[in-house]
Each structure stands twice: as C-alpha cells, then as structure tokens.
Amino acid sequence: MEYRPNDSITRAEITVIVARIQGQTGAVAQADTVFTDVPSTYWASGYIASATNQGIINGYGDGTFGPDDKVLYEDVIKMLMETLGYKPYAQNNGGYPTGYILAAQRQSVLKNVVGGAEGTEATRGQVAQMTYNAIDTPLMERYVYGGEAQYVIWDGESWSPRKTLMNQALGINKLKGVVTENEVTALDAAVQIDTDATQQIKLYVEDNYLGSNDTNSDYEVDSVYPFYTGDTNAADYLGYDVVLYAQDNKNETDTILSITEATGKNSKVEFTLDKFNSYDADTNNLSYMKNDTDKSATKLKLQTTSNRVNYSDSPAIIYNGIAYSGTLESLFGSYEGDESGLIYKDSAYSGKVTVLDNDDTSGYDVIFVDVAVGAVVDELSSRGVLTFKNSVD
C-alpha cells in the first residue's frame, strides 16, 4: 500500500484515525448516526457515531456530515485537540478554529508539519505528522480536588505525572537509555547464546518520560530491563544512547516497535585499522592519523570515570561483535611505539575502529573493533575442519 503523502484525506478517514489513536484498534461495529448521509451500512458509520457522541466531530449544520468530502486543515486540528481534551482551552481562546490552532501550537502538535493553512485541504503527510505529534502530547482532563473542578494538563511537571494517548490508550512505553546487551554480548561480557529464544536487548533506562511524580511506571530510571526486538534492528544499537517505543505486553517482556539514536548523543569517530597510531595509558588517549599526510596524530580522550552502564572506569570494548575481556593495553599497547597489542596483528587485515561517546560528558564510552580477514580455503577435512592458505588461523 502506498503512502502518497501529498494526497488529500476524507472526513471519514480522519474520524477512523481519531478512533484508532484512542485505542480502538479492532473493527468498530456499524451503527446508526445522526447524519442523513451516513447510513448504518456505511463502512465508517460506527467510528462516526462514536466520535459524534464524544463531541469530537460535527456535521455541516444541515443534517449532513460529508464523509467522503476532503477534510480541511483546521478540522484535523480541531478533532485532534478535542481528542486530547483541549476543548475548554480552545473555547477560552477564541473557539473554532483560532483557539484549537493556538492549543495545537502551544502543545507542539504542529511541529514539523509542512505547509497547511485555514481553508485548505489537509494532506496525508500533514495528518500523519500531526497524529504522530498528538499521541505523545500531554492530555488535558477535568480534575476535581477539594470539591473544586479544574482542568489539568498532565505534562509531568510540578505534581502531575505525564499522561498521553501513547501511554494511556495505546499501551506504548517511550523510553530513553543505553542498549547494554544484545543476543550475542553485553557491553562487559559475552552472553550465552540461545538460538531458540526470541531475540532481546537490554536497556539501561535514563528517562521514562513520565515525570518525577509518577509512581506506577513499569520502568524505573537507572535500572536495566529486557525487551524483545520485534521487527527492528535494535541489536545493532549496542552501546548507543537511544529512544525506543515498546508495546506493553502486560506482565510479559515488552516488544520494541521503533528505535532511533537519541538526539544530541552518540558522538563517534571511525577510522580504518591502518590509521591507528597508539594508546597512551598515562593520559588515556587513543590516537589515529586522519590522513596519510598528517604530521601528528589526532587524540581521542577515553572515559576515566565510572560508567553508569558497565560500572567501569574504562570504555567497554566490543571486538568483532563480542565483549573483549582484556585490557586496553592488551589490545592497543600502552604507549606510542609499543606494538605488543593485538591491534598490531590485526592491522595487517582490513577493518575499522569506531570510538563512541554515548553521553557527551566524560570521554568516549565504547570502542568497537571490527576485523575482516580475507582467506583462501586450502583443504576441507572429512571431519569438517577447514585449512586456509597463507597461514591464516
């Protein structure tokens, strides 16, 4: 199915979207509506009836709804902000459409929405971006305290926890943290590989996006939790600071729906093995030559304070995808000219070194060394043992 972001969208289709982000994931039964042009047999009649009863949608005032009409930009905004509970705010700030547009702007529902103006048809791309923003927007709800009713925006600030359609209606947890383990290795040690198990990662949680006043989170900050990788490439983010969205599987391990690098984190430097220069144990600097014409090496400061992820005062080292159990000195040597490290043997092969700073605070936190050895098979024994030419082990 094609996305077609520049195509328009109908009033019935946006009504279904509004229902879905409220957690109505299954088919909604067809139902009678108050509109003369939406019979109970219409494919979206149940969604339209439900949204009408919630006060989210209105007709044209003549008894019709126009389900197949193209929806206007400001009508999408109104429906989304009504769904989020901002009707009182909008009515106190000019009503339709001004108050709803103001509410959407204040709550960043229009962030990254390209184009769009009152009186124009909304595009699928605009609706997708607004919906994406809306599900992670704090809900506004009527709250009674001390017998007095007031409206509260559940933004996680002050005394209130953070409530959104994402975590309240859709059962999706948003988390930020460092991937500390995949199905092959942790940052500090290899793991037992179970080929029959569902692939998992582990995440050191830095932020659960619920605010400091939430006491019911499944994920506590500064703790490590497992996640099924689902259809994502989450295992590739070992050592990286990420933001992930995971489907709440109730009392089971949650499944990742999406994962990306965290904004403003994960500074990294890559160089090929032949560009490696030295490691200085006294200064804890790793150096390499950026170019063949450089007269001096570029120095990279490695972390020297206790790491919140692997509880070590030196970087985690991942060698060909597996945690390296040796020291920095055993891998790189300990001073310029010291060629005792394993890296000097590997520099004869092709490969690269990636040095990652996942927190941008105290030096580089993770070192990835990837070595590829080219070899020609000389013999395959009856027992399945390979012998290579050129003395390759």
Spans of features found by a protein language model:
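Feature responds to low-complexity, polar/acidic, surface-exposed segments characteristic
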Residues: M1-S45, Q54-E74, L80-E121, I135-Q199, ...
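Extracellular, beta-strand-rich glycan-interacting domains
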Residues: Q126, T131-I135
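Short, flexible, surface-exposed loop segments at domain boundaries
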Residues: Q129, L139-D393
